[in-house]
Amino acid sequence: MTNIRKSHPLMKIVNHSLIDLPAPSNISAWWNFGSLLGLCLGIQIITGLFLAMHYTSDTLTAFSSVTHICRDVNYGWIIRYLHANGASMFFICLFLHVGRGIYYGSYTYSETWNIGILLLFAVMATAFMGYVLPWGQMSFWGATVITNLLSAIPYIGTDLVQWIWGGFSVDKATLTRFFAFHFILPFIIAALVMVHLLFLHETGSNNPTGIISDADKIPFHPYYTIKDALGFLLLTALLLTLVLFSPDLLGDPDNYTPANPLNTPPHIKPEWYFLFAYAILRSIPNKLGGVLALVLSIAILAVMPLLHTSKQRSMMFRPISQCLFWVLVADLLTLTWIGGQPVEHPFIIIGQLASFLYFSLILILMPTCSLIENKLLKW
């Protein structure tokens, strides 16, 4: 008799994805972030569901409903902080996951990579709308500033912004629709994750060497299930440490002040994980140019498979490319720092140089460097 996990229609899918899946024998801890992202999504959906049971999406009661969750609901405070800090963990894992893809050349699986970029956009949209829901000062002004950027689109811009707002300013209609979208998007993300995995399992995983590993595969279970379980344990420990010891470390104090359309905060800035893109947006003096740069800062990832000029897939044996990769990492950290600073000298010029370097590295320096390394192979 055939084993039920190999014959049952539903169990068969799970078996081929998580148990009998042939995996490269040498994938490192950098390959753990895919499963960690799945864990983050699960945590966000569960905590978000419980928060939605007590939250009211009305401008008059939204702020006090969040206060009510923290003060009166059983363990409401931990659910709220798990959700808020879970988003930070989500983005840490996302950035590391994308960084791994760039370093080891995983972007050459272009379908998987492109679905990943769509996922990144979807998660960023979800996080932005979620930040608006508590209806604090930074929620309101963040929503006003970011949605206002769409007015830079020629001809239809102003109408588009008012259509999104549902009126002539960010108000009750905006909050209600943002709540609706914030609730539905994680389920769309979950569906996209399935497509992402479908395409990944068509080709199989890449590995640190970038060399085809068909000759040396091991079953996913027990080797990588145990490895993922360790990752889960470490991520959960880190998240709980953050939630239980310094839950407001990554938040903005302004968001503990109820939204007031008549009082603008001195420094409007998004959550830390958007600061790099915000710095790129601010580095361009023109409004439309800034919006384009903002979108391109993520969309530029889509051209990476086209700009892969190296004869080797991974950067493991390419020291010059490795240097440029770490310059890119340092540049993104610089942009993140600049995004949180006021718009004044010397931060303006640092932001402009860092933005220029970001696009130059991806579009010009890294592909050129790969060509030089190809020449060095022949020496």
From Swiss-Prot:
Heme b b562 binds at residues 83, 182. CDD domains: cytochrome_b_C (cd00290), Cytochrome_b_N (cd00284). Binds 2 heme b groups non-covalently. Its main location: mitochondrion. It is a multi-pass membrane protein. Belongs to the cytochrome b family. This is Cytochrome b.
